[in-house]
Regions:
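C-terminal helix-to-coil terminal segments
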Residues: 58-116
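Rossmann-like adenosine-cofactor binding region
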Residues: 1-67
Length: 116
């Protein structure tokens, strides 16, 4: 999945999606702003893009009047990341504290400079 950066905003636009082979399928579970929604809708309606499954959108929640709801070739899934499992969370936090205290590598650090 791509981070949302100035370089990736709108990356799934008409110009780039037209480079996909006829009948390609678009899946976006990363960031809504990666997709130019009007371009995707037109390419699906014209048949160049076979369909799409989308979990993220430029505006969330997706407004009831959005045309994606009425496009049978676009599947919309609920944007639900995951449930937090208490025991697993406590274990991960303890491991990170232990690594910090020992001067070891702390796993799972978010790199804000990369846009994550």
């Amino acid at each position: 999945m791509l981070p949302l950066t100035p370089e990736t905003t709108g990356i799934l636009n008409r110009k780039n999606m037209e480079k996909l082979p006829q009948g390609a399928y678009v899946i976006n579970v990363a960031r809504g702003a990666h997709v130019v929604e009007a371009d995707l809708l037109e390419l699906v309606q014209f048949g160049h893009i076979e369909g799409a499954t989308l979990d993220v959108f430029g505006h969330e929640p997706l407004p009831p009047a959005h045309p994606f709801w009425n496009e049978p070739e676009i599947t919309i899934t609920p944007h639900i990341a995951a449930l937090t499992v208490r025991d697993e969370s406590v274990k991960q936090i303890a491991e990170k504290i232990r690594a910090l205290e020992q001067g070891s590598l702390i796993r799972g650090i978010v790199d804000r400079l990369k846009g994550y």
